[in-house]
């Protein structure tokens, strides 16, 4: 299975924050083929290890995706919900969803007051998620409950993976099944040869709601160095200034120098030196980023224990946190090469 095939399979799985079971199970079965040990910690993180000597390097990718959770069922069987993770409300209206009921999965659609019944001033306003609902076809509260829906039932977005042109893919949860796919492919390649370091491949939980799993797993592993794998915003489409997001699809993985204007991660200089040297040695094109917006698992990892030298390598993506994220397959493959060779060279830098 190639890294692209891994991504296609992972994207189709459903696993919002705190409900990553199906993603974890798939990754566990794959990593058991390539690693010396695989375990699930008390928090739900998946921790696989390869090698028993040399420096400890932690490679982390979060398994969770954004989603919804049912908080109320009205008398007519419509579901009101809260958001799990960072969602911009207009991107979810009229989308198809999967409601993961106790009796099996149900298809639903997100609805709201139709524009035909809105006043003119209403049409100019953004429809907030509080004014949306999920329609599962139930005709009463009792029927919705009988179908297996309860308070706390989790909901994920329904979206297939499609090829866009020659080199692009679109689908849901590329944030961060992209990182998970890279993690699996890297460990598969490492399984075919001897290594002189200890590699911890970690599928973290609950990144989208506070970087929680990364903090717990990093404390347990206490690595010498860590790299978080994620996506970052590509600014190569209309509506965004190049200076605000100078990252393009198809030009290679992105190395984060700073994110959240320094409130998140300030990447350790030794990690940046390693990535730069490896990219030059193996002729891997990379992009460099100083970010002002969000952050990644790297923020939690680098503040663990006495501090862990940490960096982040991302795959550029368009339309992050929507059901139609877009990435370039070439960036995915180059990210595998970069991470793989960083692991091979880690003892030369730490």
Swiss-Prot record:
Per the UniProt entry, the signal peptide is: none
Q: Which organism is it from?
A: Methanocaldococcus jannaschii (strain ATCC 43067 / DSM 2661 / JAL-1 / JCM 10045 / NBRC 100440)
Q: Superkingdom of the source?
A: Archaea
Q: Which family does it belong to?
A: Belongs to the peptidase M42 family.
Which UniProt key words apply to this protein?
A: Aminopeptidase, Hydrolase, Metal-binding, Metalloprotease, Protease
State the coiled-coil residue ranges.
Answer: none
An example Gene Ontology molecular-function term: metallopeptidase activity
Enzyme class, spelled out: hydrolase
| EC numbers on record | 3.4.11.-
Q: What is this protein called?
A: Putative aminopeptidase MJ0555
Residues forming the catalytic site? 207 (proton acceptor)
Q: How is the cofactor bound?
A: Binds 2 divalent metal cations per subunit.
Tell me which Gene Ontology terms the entry assigns under biological process: proteolysis
**Which residues are a divalent metal cation 1-binding?**
62, 175, 230
A Pfam family reported for this protein in Swiss-Prot or TrEMBL? Peptidase_M42
What's the cofactor? a divalent metal cation
Keyword Metal-binding assigned: yes
- DNA damage among keywords: no
Q: Any idea which positions bind a divalent metal cation 2?
A: 175, 208, 321
Q: Which Gene3D superfamilies match?
A: Peptidase M42, domain 2, Zn peptidases
């Amino acid at each position: 299975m190639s890294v692209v095939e891994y991504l296609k399979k992972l994207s189709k799985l459903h696993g919002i924050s705190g409900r990553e079971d199906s993603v974890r199970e798939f990754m566990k079965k794959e990593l058991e083929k390539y690693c010396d040990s695989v375990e699930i910690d008390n928090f739900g993180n998946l921790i696989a290890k390869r090698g028993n000597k040399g420096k400890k390097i932690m490679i982390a990718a979060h398994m969770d995706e954004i989603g919804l959770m049912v908080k109320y069922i009205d008398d007519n069987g419509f579901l009101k919900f809260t958001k799990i993770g960072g969602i911009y409300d207009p991107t979810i209206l009229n989308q198809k969803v999967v409601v993961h009921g106790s009796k099996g999965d149900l298809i639903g659609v997100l609805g709201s007051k139709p524009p035909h019944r809105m006043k003119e001033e209403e049409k100019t306003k953004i429809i907030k998620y509080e004014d949306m609902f999920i329609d599962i076809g139930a005709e009463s509260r009792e029927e919705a409950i009988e179908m297996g829906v309860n308070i706390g039932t989790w909901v994920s977005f329904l979206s297939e993976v499609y090829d866009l042109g020659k080199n692009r893919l679109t689908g849901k949860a590329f944030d961060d099944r992209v990182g998970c796919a890279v993690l699996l492919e890297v460990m598969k390649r490492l399984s075919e040869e001897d290594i002189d370091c200890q590699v911890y491949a970690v599928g973290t939980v609950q990144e989208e709601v506070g970087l929680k799993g990364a903090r717990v797993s990093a404390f347990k592993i206490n690595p010498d160095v860590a790299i978080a794998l994620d996506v970052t915003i590509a600014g190569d489409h209309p509506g965004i200034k190049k200076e605000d997001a100078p990252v393009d699809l198809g030009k290679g993985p992105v190395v984060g120098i700073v994110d959240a204007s320094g409130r998140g991660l300030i990447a350790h200089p030794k990690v940046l030196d390693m990535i730069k040297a490896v990219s030059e040695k193996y002729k891997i094109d990379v992009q460099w980023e100083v970010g002002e917006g969000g952050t990644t698992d790297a923020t939690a990892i680098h503040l663990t224990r006495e501090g862990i030298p940490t960096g982040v390598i991302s795959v550029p993506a368009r339309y992050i946190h929507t059901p139609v994220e877009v990435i370039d397959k070439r960036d995915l493959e180059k990210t595998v090469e970069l991470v793989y060779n960083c692991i091979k060279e880690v003892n030369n830098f730490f």
